[in-house]
């Protein structure tokens, strides 16, 4: 059944639709009983998605409430042991809220996430190694278990970078490894940020330290405040900055960094000295300007071709760095 396309909505209208749909979904899923598989969205996952949306909207109270709901309803706990250092490939781990369980005939082989990330398979991940910003790596404490996610000593590191070891195949022969879409740790970090934004530094530190004690037993945060630098590399020493740093480390290679860059309105600088080959650096785009339209995708031409209520002269997003 064909339906006529609508005209371009405002951002406000889009978010009204998103939040309305999520609220309806959370209510319905809450009444639907226990889900049958980890790949299915349940009430906790829907609450986690709502928390993600609320961060972008800067609706801090909703983000806090949704993150706390996700934590309380998920039955998950902050991961330790192999749930952290085992390759991020197991949908049954106690910290996983939502994931796709990959079996051999669904692996995708070359066209898969772990092929893209895991250099030990000898394919794409080996020819274009994924490496962390060395400045970010330096933020890890001496006893932080997440240091195992990167290998500064690998002889195959490009340009003295630190290759990732966080994401590994579960079975190299079968090309399998589960895809994790949401972990409970993200909800702790979201609750910490939202609390900080609401001027509840004590509550923010409680959530942050609850997570970090499972990563580095020597870690304790006593910081306060919400100041952020113009660039991600500009340091203010605030509590909010510390939460964002730990969010970058904990969720590295997983969810949402591009959304965080946009919503935090921080530019960034990437150089070869930070651990990447020059050929991998972004060229021709002012990455220090978080408001650049270079970060905004254009609407596909097919949408204009098939929708009489869309006008490319009025409804298309600006192209390039146009303000």
Q: Where in this protein do the model-derived segments appear?
A:
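Mobile gating loops/cap/lid regions near enzyme active sites that modulate substrate access
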Residues: 117-118
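Active-site core of glycosidic bond-cleaving carbohydrate-active enzymes
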Residues: 121-148
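Acidic/polar-rich alpha-helix caps and helix-coil junctions
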Residues: 1-114, 139-323
């Amino acid at each position: 059944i064909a339906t006529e396309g609508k005209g371009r909505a405002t951002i406000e209208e889009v978010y009204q639709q998103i939040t309305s749909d999520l609220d309806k979904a959370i209510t319905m899923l809450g009444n639907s009983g226990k889900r049958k598989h980890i790949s299915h969205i349940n009430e906790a996952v829907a609450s986690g998605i709502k928390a993600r949306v609320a961060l972008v909207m800067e609706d801090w109270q909703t983000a806090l409430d949704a993150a706390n709901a996700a934590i309380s309803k998920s039955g998950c706990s902050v991961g330790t042991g192999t749930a952290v250092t085992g390759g991020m490939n197991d949908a049954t781990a106690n910290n996983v809220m939502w994931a796709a369980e990959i079996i051999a005939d669904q692996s995708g082989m070359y066209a898969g996430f772990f092929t893209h990330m895991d250099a030990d398979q000898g394919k794409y991940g080996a020819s274009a190694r994924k490496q962390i910003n060395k400045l970010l790596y330096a933020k890890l404490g001496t006893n932080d278990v997440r240091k195992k996610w990167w290998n500064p000593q690998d002889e195959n590191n490009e340009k003295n970078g630190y290759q990732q070891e966080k994401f590994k195949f579960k079975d190299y022969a079968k090309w399998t490894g589960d895809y994790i879409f949401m972990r409970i740790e993200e909800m702790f970090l979201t609750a910490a940020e939202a609390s900080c934004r609401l001027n509840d530094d004590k509550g923010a530190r409680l959530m942050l330290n609850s997570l970090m004690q499972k990563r580095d037993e020597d870690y304790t945060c006593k910081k306060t405040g919400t100041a952020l630098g113009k660039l991600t590399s500009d340091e203010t020493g605030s509590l909010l900055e510390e939460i964002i740093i730990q969010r970058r480390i904990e969720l590295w290679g997983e969810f949402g960094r591009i959304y965080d860059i946009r919503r935090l309105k921080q530019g960034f600088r990437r150089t070869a000295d930070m651990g990447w080959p020059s050929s991998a650096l972004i060229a021709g785009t002012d990455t220090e300007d978080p408001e650049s339209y270079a970060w905004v995708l254009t609407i596909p031409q097919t949408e204009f071709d098939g929708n009489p209520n869309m006008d490319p002269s009025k409804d298309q997003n600006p192209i390039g760095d146009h303000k």
